[in-house]
Design a protein with these regions (language model features):
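Radical SAM enzyme [4Fe-4S]-AdoMet core and its adjacent flexible, acidic
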Residues: 28, 50, 93-96, 111, ...
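Secreted/processed peptides and extracellular or luminal domains of membrane proteins
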Residues: 39, 43-46, 252, 270, ...
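Cys/His/Pro-rich metal-binding microdomains
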Residues: 34, 38-41, 247, 297-300
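Processing junctions and N-termini across compartments
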Residues: 27, 31-34, 240, 290-293
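Flexible mid-to-C-terminal extensions adjoining Fe-S/redox cofactors in radical SAM and related proteins
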Residues: 8-16, 21, 243, 258-324
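Conserved alpha-helical substructure of the radical SAM core
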Residues: 1-112, 118, 312, 320-324
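Conserved residues at the C-terminal ends of beta-strands
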Residues: 43, 73, 122, 186, ...
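Short loop/turn motifs at secondary-structure junctions
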Residues: 36, 66-67, 115, 151, ...
Length: 324
């Protein structure tokens, strides 16, 4: 975390290692987006969204189950008008709150985020940003500047590394330092269902240049730039080889906008529904989740990798990974 808390760390160990329960509720808070990024599949599937009272009940269940972190994300949380009430309810239950956004509505809604602890904004480049996201970087910068002065912890900019933005990475890191915000990196994940033309356009083709870029990220981290990733993780990113035991589906309870529960961002087939009760779904699917993790070829989503390494008490990650 950006601010290490021995108490929260102890609660996390108790919840995950002793009780064998998740520590984080990752909630797809809506099914709509105000961007149309070619490499993303989420915005293409608008569907049913839980009513506010159902979300409150979900949060109540989660807290009763021992979950201490609420993460609101996907498709674009700031499109959900009741977001402030949802965050407030989570905070009143004693949960740490976090939010992932594309930032387009951040300037407009930043004042409403008084109950938010951690904010992550997707910033995938400087010169390449418009080509990647379809809007100009200038559209989101005022919101980032405004929000960083409202939330309690350092704001995070997350960059997905692709073939489009390799020339922007060092500038982006320097920009993060100048703005007094944190920055994280992860490689692009090739979701099924996205056109091959998109991957041909966005994918990493020049591996030598890619590795030089990641080497520079590692160097700049060691030089003290505000990069939250661990070196252990960044070395995996450099080789695009996930060398870890995944515990994402033990750490995180993943709930969709319609209330269905899925294994993780990669294995998205529903394994239950909150109407069953999350405790029942968790216990019933224990073997299924274990089998899925064992058979998975693994991804490099930084939240999954870093937290799985933390779960296994990796010392370097514990020392140098700085986020939820």
């Amino acid at each position: 975390m950006s601010k290490y808390s021995p108490l929260i760390a102890a609660k996390a160990v108790w919840q995950m290692r002793i009780r064998k329960r998740p520590f984080v509720l990752s909630h797809a808070i809506n099914s709509r987006c105000n961007m149309r990024c070619s490499f993303c599949e989420y915005w293409k599937n608008e569907g049913v969204e839980m009513e506010l009272d159902d979300i409150f009940r979900l949060l109540d269940q989660a807290r009763d189950f021992g979950i201490l972190v609420y993460n609101a994300w996907t498709v674009e949380p700031l499109l959900r008008k009741e977001l402030p009430q949802i965050l407030r309810h989570a905070k009143q239950l004693g949960m740490v709150t976090s939010l992932i956004t594309n930032g387009l509505l951040l300037e407009k809604r930043a004042d409403e985020l008084v109950d938010l602890d951690y904010l992550s904004v997707s910033v995938d480049g400087t010169a390449s940003y418009q080509d990647i996201r379809g809007v100009s970087l200038e559209r989101i910068m005022p919101g980032i500047i405004k929000a960083k002065n409202i939330i309690n912890n350092p704001l995070l900019m997350n960059c997905v590394i692709s073939g489009k933005n390799l020339d922007d990475i060092e500038e982006l890191i320097t920009m993060a330092q100048d703005m007094d915000v944190k920055i994280s990196f992860e490689p692009m994940y090739e979701f099924q269902g996205i056109a091959s033309d998109t991957w041909n356009d966005m994918g990493i083709r020049d591996m030598e240049k890619y590795r030089r870029t990641v080497d520079r990220i590692i160097e700049m981290k060691k030089e003290g730039y505000p990069i939250i990733n661990s070196c252990t993780y960044l070395k995996m990113v450099r080789e695009l080889k996930p060398a870890f035991n995944c515990h994402a589906n033990e750490i995180i309870l993943d709930v969709n906008a319609d209330g269905s529960i899925e294994n993780c961002r990669v294995h998205r087939s529903p394994i239950g529904h909150i109407s069953e009760g999350i405790a029942k779904v968790w216990e019933r699917t224990r073997k299924t989740r274990k089998d899925t993790a064992r058979e998975c070829s693994k991804c490099l989503f930084f939240g999954y990798v870093e937290n799985s390494l933390m779960y296994n008490f990796n010392l370097e990650v514990a020392q140098h990974y700085e986020w939820m």
